[in-house]
């Protein structure tokens, strides 16, 4: 009897603490991705505590280097941080396409993963994962309608993220 209880406890703990595999888009047109994106929603992060009206701007500096500038408003003041992104290991740039859509971004504290797990065909909406605990829903528009938001949240849910923790910007 104790063995069965122990097995059940181990299975439950494994399910709770298991890490999902973050699957990036198979490719990303780098030029089309450049420019300003508005944060629509995110999973909570310590480095964005209190942030509202967040944006991210991407500028191609070299074929393998992107400047990333993140802005947000905290208590009425604009906070900005600039870093660089480079292709992740096992990622290649072929004819302007990042294959797969995986980068490593550095804001001065070491590199972190940046995986585009969804991009619509018109490059108007994107979902980015920084791993198992960080995620952003981005748009070219500051505001999106509820139907589009719900569709993007469904994609996030289907990727295995807890959508109950999303913070809408």
UniProtKB/Swiss-Prot annotation:
Recite the UniProt keywords alphabetically.
Answer: Secreted, Signal, Transport, Virion
Q: Name one GO cellular component term.
A: extracellular region
Q: Report disulfide bridges, numbered on this chain.
A: none
Q: Does the keyword Secreted apply?
A: yes
The signal peptide here is 1-18
**Localization terms from the record:** Secreted; Virion
Q: Which GO terms describe its biological process?
A: response to stress
Top-level taxon of origin: Viruses
Chief site of localization: secreted
Q: Output the Gene3D superfamilies linked to this UniProt entry.
A: 2.40.128.20
Q: What does this protein do?
A: Could play a role in the transport of a small ligand.
- PANTHER family, alphabetized: APOLIPOPROTEIN D (PTHR10612:SF34)
What protein family does this chain belong to? Belongs to the calycin superfamily. Lipocalin family.
What's the protein name?
Putative lipocalin R877
Q: Which organism is it from?
A: Acanthamoeba polyphaga mimivirus
């Amino acid at each position: 009897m104790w063995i069965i209880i122990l097995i059940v406890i181990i299975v439950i703990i494994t399910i709770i603490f298991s890490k999902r595999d973050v699957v990036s888009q198979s490719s990303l047109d780098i030029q089309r991705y450049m420019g300003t994106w508005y944060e629509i929603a995110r999973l909570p992060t310590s480095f964005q505590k209190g942030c509202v009206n967040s944006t991210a701007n991407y500028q191609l500096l070299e074929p393998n280097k992107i400047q990333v500038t993140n802005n947000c408003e905290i208590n009425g003041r604009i906070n900005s941080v600039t870093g660089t992104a480079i292709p992740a290991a096992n990622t290649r740039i072929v004819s302007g396409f990042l294959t797969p859509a995986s980068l490593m971004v550095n804001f001065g504290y070491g590199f972190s993963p940046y995986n585009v797990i969804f991009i619509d065909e018109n490059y108007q909406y994107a979902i980015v994962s920084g791993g198992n605990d960080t995620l952003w829903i981005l748009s070219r528009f500051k505001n999106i309608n509820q139907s589009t938001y719900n569709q993007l949240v469904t994609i996030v849910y289907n990727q295995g993220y807890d959508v109950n923790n999303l913070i809408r910007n």
